[in-house]
C-alpha cells in the first residue's frame, strides 16, 4: 500500500492472551482515539459492552485499489469504563493503559540504584520484563556515566525511563505492544511532500521557541567534562543580553574527527541556541511513524523543509484514521 494516498479504513478490536501475546476473541468498538508519546501510549475507546479488565489489541483494516492489510494500532490494558445510557442504548467509554502498566504498578525496594558503568538498556529491559509484552534492546547501548538512584516511591517503569534518558536513548512501544529500547532513529521513517502524494492536511501550526535556548553548556564524556558559555554582548541569547545563565548538560557525546571535548561543547552550544521550530499538523495514518522518529517535510511554499523529530501523536479511530502530531526541526 501507498500510505501517502487515500485509503478506506475500518477497525478491529481483539482480546489478547497475556501468556502468548496472541489475539483471541473479538470485541465491538464504535470509536475513540489513541495518544502516543515517546515511551508511552494510551487509548480512549467507546465500546458496546463492558470489557472488564483485559488485554486488547486494536487494528486498522485499510483498503486501497483492491490492495489492503491489517495494521496493529494499539495494544494495552482496559480499565473500569464509564457507562453512558441513551434511551435503551448503552455504551461504555473505556480508558486503556499502556503495555507498561504492570511495571508502573510495581514499586522498587528502597535503596535501589543503577550503578555507574552498568549497561543502561539491559537494566531498563529487566525492569520492564514484568510486563507480558516482549521487551528487547539494541546491543550497542552505552554504559551509565553516573549512578541513577531511585526516588521514594519509584516504580519499575519510571526507573526504566530515567535510566534510558540517562544514556540518551528512548523507549518505543509499537502498535502490537512490543517494546524496544534503542537510540533515537537517525534516518527518516517517512517523507511528506506537497508534490508527491501529499498526506498532510492544509492546516499547520509553525512555532518558534527561543526562550529555552541555553547560554551555558556542560558536556560529560566518561571522567572528562568541558563547558562552553555565550557571554557575547552582541548575542541575543547571551548571559549579558538575557541577564541570567541558562544551563544545559549533555552526557551523550559524539566527537567529530580530531575534535576535542572543548570544541564539541562550543559547537553544540551554537547548535542548541538555534531556536526550536515546531510544526503541528494532521495527516493520513502511516504505520512507519512513531513518536521519536524522524520525518522529512517538504512544504517550501510555507517555509517548512527538512528533517523533523516527531513528538506527541493522536490517532483518531474513525474516518481516514487521521493522525495529529507535532514535530520539531532538527536539520536539513
Protein language model features and the residues they cover:
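Short beta-strand and beta-hairpin "edge-sheet" elements
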Residues: 64-96, 172-173, 295-324
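Surface-exposed cap/loop segments at beta↔alpha junctions
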Residues: 49-134, 331
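Acidic, small/polar-enriched beta strand-loop surface segments
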Residues: 1-10, 161, 175, 183-320, ...
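Polar/acidic, low-complexity leader/linker segments enriched in S/T/G and N/D
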Residues: 1-27
Amino acid at each position: 500500500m501507498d500510505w501517502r494516498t487515500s485509503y478506506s479504513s475500518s477497525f478491529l478490536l481483539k482480546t489478547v492472551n497475556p501468556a502468548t501475546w496472541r489475539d483471541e476473541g473479538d470485541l465491538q468498538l464504535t470509536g475513540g482515539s489513541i495518544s502516543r508519546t515517546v515511551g508511552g501510549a494510551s487509548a480512549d475507546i467507546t465500546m458496546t459492552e463492558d470489557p472488564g479488565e483485559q488485554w486488547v489489541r486494536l487494528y486498522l483494516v485499510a483498503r486501497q485499489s483492491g490492495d489492503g492489510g491489517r495494521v496493529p494500532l494499539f495494544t494495552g490494558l482496559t480499565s473500569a469504563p464509564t457507562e453512558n445510557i441513551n434511551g435503551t442504548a448503552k455504551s461504555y467509554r473505556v480508558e486503556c493503559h499502556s503495555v507498561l502498566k504492570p511495571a508502573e504498578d510495581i514499586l522498587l525496594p528502597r535503596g535501589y540504584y543503577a550503578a555507574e558503568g552498568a549497561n543502561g538498556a539491559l537494566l531498563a529491559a529487566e525492569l520492564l520484563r514484568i510486563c507480558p509484552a516482549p521487551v528487547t534492546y539494541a546491543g550497542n547501548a552505552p554504559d551509565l556515566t553516573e549512578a541513577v538512584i531511585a526516588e521514594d516511591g519509584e516504580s519499575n517503569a519510571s526507573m526504566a525511563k530515567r535510566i534510558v534518558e540517562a544514556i540518551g536513548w528512548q523507549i518505543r512501544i509499537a502498535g502490537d505492544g512490543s517494546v524496544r529500547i534503542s537510540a533515537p532513529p537517525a534516518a527518516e521513517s517517512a517523507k511528506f511532500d506537497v508534490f508527491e502524494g501529499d498526506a498532510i492536511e492544509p492546516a499547520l501550526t509553525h512555532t518558534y521557541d527561543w526562550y529555552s535556548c541555553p547560554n551555558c553548556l556542560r558536556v560529560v564524556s566518561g571522567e572528562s567534562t568541558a563547558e562552553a558559555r555565550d557571554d557575547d554582548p552582541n548575542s541575543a541569547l547571551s548571559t549579558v543580553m538575557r541577564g541570567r545563565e541558562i544551563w544545559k548538560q549533555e552526557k551523550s557525546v559524539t566527537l567529530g574527527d580530531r575534535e576535542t571535548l572543548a570544541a564539541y561543547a562550543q559547537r553544540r552550544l551554537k547548535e542548541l541556541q538555534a531556536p526550536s521550530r515546531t510544526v503541528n499538523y494532521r495527516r493520513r495514518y502511516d504505520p512507519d511513524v512513531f513518536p521519536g522518529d524522524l520525518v522529512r517535510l517538504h512544504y517550501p511554499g510555507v517555509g517548512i523543509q527538512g528533517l523533523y523529530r516527531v513528538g506527541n501523536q493522536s490517532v483518531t479511530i474513525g474516518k481516514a484514521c487521521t493522525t495529529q502530531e507535532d514535530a520539531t526541526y532538527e536539520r536539513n
